[in-house]
């Protein structure tokens, strides 16, 4: 077996998706604890308590002024090397979150068992559907009172349109949470409270009919036997092929805060989740075992510190191997670059990367030349596909305090849109500039960066725009007619792509009915 194949086979690259407050940060913590990356997990407490989560723990790096928001954490587990990509929480939610999902091979979906499927989870699952990403599910917060577990699985199946196969099943919940039954191993793992900061030695009872179970949990033993008869009759069995096709999700129950059940998920990810997969380019499919290096940029982390203009581009390695000091070909620019200072993120600490393999994420210092979707190779003219732009969900008109700086404003907005910080739209019929974003924080960041980096002071105004769609049509004549009749709703984005700006969803739906030959797209390839 080649050295590269051994390294590829070891890797599992996944992201955690959840609604805010479902426990994603706590799970990230505990996952790192099991990966020996942390000795004692720091629970996410109120910010005043001084005990911050390790994945929220990097203050802005003082010397470079870059915040890397622990976007990537790499750690060993059971003979595998796991790359966990963090998706930002509600405060800094942006398109970055969506695009991070294009750089992983599987996802862990975390659901608050008291609340069930929530809005952000629905949105993120839509994005995983673009590539049929395999999903592992964790029903969290069993140490609180929860909804009926069968009802929770039913909701996942109906709302997210994915079959559920329980792997573990809860025994009690809240103050009466006793542990879980592992359906595939035929064993009960008992829960001990107050062990959240360390890896606990769990008590395992083999077999549901074992008298030790009755001795350990009393009347709950009979209840769980009865309940499991119903569960086994009403639920799906785990099927690896369906899981890898993104059609079925294995479901685990536990409490991240109590550090119970997290190792069960990791066991499942290492055993079943795909190793780094082949990636499509415009020319051919790139296999991870290919000898020559290739990778693509899926995220650019801009500094939030006006004193520094440096940023880091996050690259997923797709084939070959990165070695310190190697020469890479930046395909879009047609230029070769020597890369000697790429970063790796072992358990959240930034280190210089000496070597990286397919599935790994490296950070490249970017002085404004890299864009999202850029491909790097060892000379081959490839371009990876499947790194999309998403239609924004919030819009503002942006206006200058000094009208003479229109040129600088446009330049700044176009550059920031290339970097993925925001999207900009120029209506065809007016001189307005409309900024679109997925998260509210993006607007604030853009105004701050326009001021510090482009010396432009701008303010936002409300605008009646509900959504945007990129428009295409194979028939040039029909497209021209559409442009003429709908010009008041049309704009060009930062890359000069034609976009329909809809004041309401009703307006969009009417236009789609009226012009059936025009394609209105929610996403656009970078």
Swiss-Prot record:
Q: Which GO terms describe its molecular function?
A: GTP binding; GTPase activity; guanosine tetraphosphate binding; translation release factor activity, codon nonspecific; translation release factor activity, codon specific
Q: Which UniProt keywords apply?
A: Cytoplasm, GTP-binding, Nucleotide-binding, Protein biosynthesis
Which GO terms are recorded in the biological process aspect for this UniProt protein?
A: regulation of translational termination
Database matches in SUPFAM superfamilies: EF-G C-terminal domain-like (SSF54980), P-loop containing nucleoside triphosphate hydrolases (SSF52540), Translation proteins (SSF50447)
Main localization is cytoplasm
* UniProt domain tr-type G: residue ranges: 9-277
> Which branch of life, at top level?
Bacteria
Query: Which residues of this UniProt protein bind GTP?
Result: 18-25, 86-90, 140-143
- Protein biosynthesis recorded as keyword: yes
Q: Which compartments is it annotated to reside in?
A: Cytoplasm
Function according to Swiss-Prot or TrEMBL: Increases the formation of ribosomal termination complexes and stimulates activities of RF-1 and RF-2. It binds guanine nucleotides and has strong preference for UGA stop codons. It may interact directly with the ribosome. The stimulation of RF-1 and RF-2 is significantly reduced by GTP and GDP, but not by GMP.
Give the UniProt family note.
Answer: Belongs to the TRAFAC class translation factor GTPase superfamily. Classic translation factor GTPase family. PrfC subfamily.
The name this protein carries in UniProt is Peptide chain release factor 3
Q: Which organism is it from?
A: Shewanella sediminis (strain HAW-EB3)
The record lists the lineage as: Bacteria, Pseudomonadati, Pseudomonadota, Gammaproteobacteria, Alteromonadales
């Amino acid at each position: 077996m080649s050295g590269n194949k051994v390294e590829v086979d070891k890797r599992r690259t996944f992201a955690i998706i959840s609604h805010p407050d479902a426990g994603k940060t706590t799970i990230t913590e505990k996952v790192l604890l099991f990966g020996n990356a942390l000795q004692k997990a720091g629970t996410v407490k109120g910010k005043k308590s001084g005990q911050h989560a390790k994945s929220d723990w990097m203050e802005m790096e003082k010397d470079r002024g870059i915040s890397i928001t622990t976007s990537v954490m790499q750690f060993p587990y059971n003979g595998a090397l796991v790359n966990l990509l963090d998706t930002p929480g509600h405060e800094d939610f942006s398109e970055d979150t969506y695009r991070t999902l294009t750089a992983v091979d599987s996802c862990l979906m975390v659901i608050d068992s008291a609340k069930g499927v929530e809005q952000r989870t629905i949105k993120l699952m839509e994005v995983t559907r673009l590539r049929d990403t395999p999903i592992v599910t964790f029903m969290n917060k069993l140490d609180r009172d929860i909804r009926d577990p069968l009802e929770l699985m039913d909701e996942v199946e109906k709302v997210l349109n994915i079959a559920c196969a329980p792997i573990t099943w809860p025994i009690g919940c809240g103050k009466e949470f006793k542990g879980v039954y592992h359906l595939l191993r035929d064993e009960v793992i008992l829960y001990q409270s107050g062990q959240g900061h360390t890896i606990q030695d769990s008590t395992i009872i083999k077999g549901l009919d074992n008298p030790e179970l009755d001795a350990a949990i009393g009347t709950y033993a009979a209840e769980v036997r009865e309940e499991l008869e119903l569960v086994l009759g009403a639920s799906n069995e785990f099927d690896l092929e369906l899981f890898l096709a993104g059609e079925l999700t294995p479901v685990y129950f536990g409490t991240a805060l109590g550090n119970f059940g997290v190792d069960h998920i990791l066991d499942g990810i290492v055993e079943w989740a795909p190793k780094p997969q082949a990636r499509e380019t415009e020319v051919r499919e790139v296999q991870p075992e290919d000898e020559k290096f290739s990778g693509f940029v899926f995220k650019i982390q801009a500094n939030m510190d006006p004193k520094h203009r440096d940023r880091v581009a996050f690259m997923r390695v797709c084939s070959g191997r990165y070695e310190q000091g190697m020469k890479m070909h930046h395909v879009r620019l047609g230029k070769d670059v020597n890369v000697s200072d790429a970063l790796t993120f072992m358990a959240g600490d930034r280190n210089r990367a000496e070597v990286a393999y397919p599935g790994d994420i490296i950070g490249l210092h970017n002085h404004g030349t890299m864009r999202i979707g850029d491909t790097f190779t060892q000379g081959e003219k490839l371009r990876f596909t499947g790194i999309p732009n998403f239609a924004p969900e919030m819009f503002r008109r942006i206006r200058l305090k000094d009208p003479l700086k229109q040129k600088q404003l446009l330049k700044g907005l176009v550059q920031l849109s290339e970097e993925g910080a925001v999207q900009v739209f120029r209506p065809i019929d007016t001189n307005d500039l409309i900024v679109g974003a997925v998260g509210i924080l993006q607007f604030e960041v853009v105004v701050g960066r326009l001021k510090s980096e482009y010396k432009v002071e701008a303010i936002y105004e409300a605008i009646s725009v509900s959504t945007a769609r990129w428009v295409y049509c194979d028939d040039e004549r029909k497209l021209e007619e559409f442009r003429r009749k709908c010009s008041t709703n049309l704009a060009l984005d930062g890359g000069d792509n034609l976009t329909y700006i809809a004041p309401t969803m009703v307006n969009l739906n009417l236009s789609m009915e009226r012009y059936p030959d025009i394609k209105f797209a929610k996403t656009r390839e970078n």
